[in-house]
Amino acid sequence: MSETLHLSAETRDRAGKGASRALRREGRTPAVIYGGNEEPVAIHLEEKALVKALGTGHFFNSVVELTVGGQTVRTLPKDVAFHPVTDRPEHADFLRVSKDSVVHVNVPVIFANEEKSPGLKKGGVLNIVRHELELVCAPDAIPDDIVIDVAGYEVGDSIHISAVKLPAGVKSAITDRDFTIATIVAPSSLKSEEGDTTKTDAEG
């Protein structure tokens, strides 16, 4: 599970593009806290602190505790808008969450034991169909990643979501089909040889 991140913020008295530009000139990033059956709260936070949090690599899969006016608000980052040229964060959205909340998150997939896959040892290629899985879980149960063991897989095999053991309390958001995450495909050289053999047989 990703560590909880902590950021300090202040409420915004004024909204609008002009006020937002003024905040950015001061090194602050405009943001909003919404959800949880409460009114949205316009805030701003230090740009450097936000950039540092983004640099952790698990920002969007972490609970972020925002300290605003002496109160701590548990949130999940939902979106960050970046400047198209400078790549500076221009705005951030935070969703209020509680321990009873259920959230949708995209979690990266990591493939393990590739050296134990007969198909890969023969020169097969791991064709990754999904680099992330859309999961449903409580905010405090968001995994850092999902590890998929490819030991034993042969060329032509497919890895479906049904073969993946998810952590306790974590479910796939897609439930209407047993979707493919990756396949072990034959190397192009092998395909070429098979094609040549077929062509020769046809000519003969």
Curated annotation (Swiss-Prot):
One of its GO terms (molecular function) is 5S rRNA binding. Part of the 50S ribosomal subunit; part of the 5S rRNA/L5/L18/L25 subcomplex. Contacts the 5S rRNA. Binds to the 5S rRNA independently of L5 and L18. This is Large ribosomal subunit protein bL25. GO terms for cellular component: cytosolic large ribosomal subunit. The keyword Membrane does not apply. Belongs to the bacterial ribosomal protein bL25 family. CTC subfamily. It comes from Novosphingobium aromaticivorans (strain ATCC 700278 / DSM 12444 / CCUG 56034 / CIP 105152 / NBRC 16084 / F199). The lineage of its organism: Bacteria, Pseudomonadati, Pseudomonadota, Alphaproteobacteria, Sphingomonadales. Keywords: Ribonucleoprotein, Ribosomal protein, RNA-binding, rRNA-binding. This is one of the proteins that binds to the 5S RNA in the ribosome where it forms part of the central protuberance.
